[in-house]
């Protein structure tokens, strides 16, 4: 079943917040947070956070065929949000949730009005609220020629997939082609695919910008079902080191 909200009746800004979701993991490997009701509540809170704090269109794509519309506030601004849900979680669960998330992005490429009318997309794990997302937006506004904004670790071998931005062209022409490589059972996850696609993009002259500030996440890890420490005292020293590394890398 395909369901959605918003048929493209408004003008599309060039930037888009894209939230990925899976309300019912249905026994997904390496996913301790399995409770659909709790997951749905977290997705709703996240959607409300971005609607209330950022004047950008929001795309939410969910792959377990679990409709979320009836749970959203009745006064939600439907012109700014597109909701898509589809039956995309029926694959070998040993492949892992990253494989499913790749399928979500592929579904957006093929079916989303918002996605296909945007130039630059910020992909965020749907249950996570990035409390300092304004800093990511500001960086993107200053680096308009950049194709990818991402946080990379371990000598650039690992890319943080919870919050990253990329041009639609990079996502469609490079990134999505790494989908079928994702397989948690052999140790190749979404983050590996993202890092490899970035290296491929650099070879094709796509432009990379490392994220200046470390994202300050509010929410919990689906893998471990543990909450993030989003307190200022925890985030600030980590971010100071992160900004210093960013400055040194640009020299």
Where are these regions (language model features)?
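ER/Golgi luminal nucleotide-sugar-dependent glycosyltransferases, focusing on the catalytic module
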Residues: 1-251
């Amino acid at each position: 079943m395909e369901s959605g909200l918003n048929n493209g009746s408004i003008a599309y800004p060039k930037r888009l917040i894209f939230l990925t979701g899976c309300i019912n993991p249905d026994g997904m490997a390496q996913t301790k947070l399995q409770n659909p009701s709790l997951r749905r509540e977290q997705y709703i809170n996240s959607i409300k956070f971005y609607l209330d704090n950022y004047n950008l269109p929001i795309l939410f794509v969910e792959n377990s065929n679990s409709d979320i519309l009836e749970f959203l506030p009745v006064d939600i601004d439907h012109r700014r949000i597109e909701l898509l849900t589809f039956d995309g979680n029926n694959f070998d669960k040993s492949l892992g949730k990253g494989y499913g998330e790749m399928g979500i992005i592929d579904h957006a490429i093929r079916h989303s009005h918002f996605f296909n009318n945007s130039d630059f997309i910020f992909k965020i794990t749907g249950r996570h609220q990035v409390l300092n997302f304004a800093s990511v937006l500001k960086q993107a506004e200053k680096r308009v020629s950049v194709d990818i904004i991402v946080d990379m670790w371990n000598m650039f071998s690992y890319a943080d997939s919870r919050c990253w931005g990329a041009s639609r062209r990079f996502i469609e022409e490079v990134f999505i082609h790494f989908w079928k490589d994702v397989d948690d059972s052999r140790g190749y996850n979404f983050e590996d695919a993202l890092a490899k696609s970035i290296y491929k993009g650099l070879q094709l002259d796509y432009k990379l910008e490392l994220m200046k500030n470390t994202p300050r996440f509010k929410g919990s890890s689906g893998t471990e079902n543990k909450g993030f420490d989003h307190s200022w005292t925890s985030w600030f020293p980590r971010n100071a080191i992160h900004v210093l590394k960013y400055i040194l890398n640009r020299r």
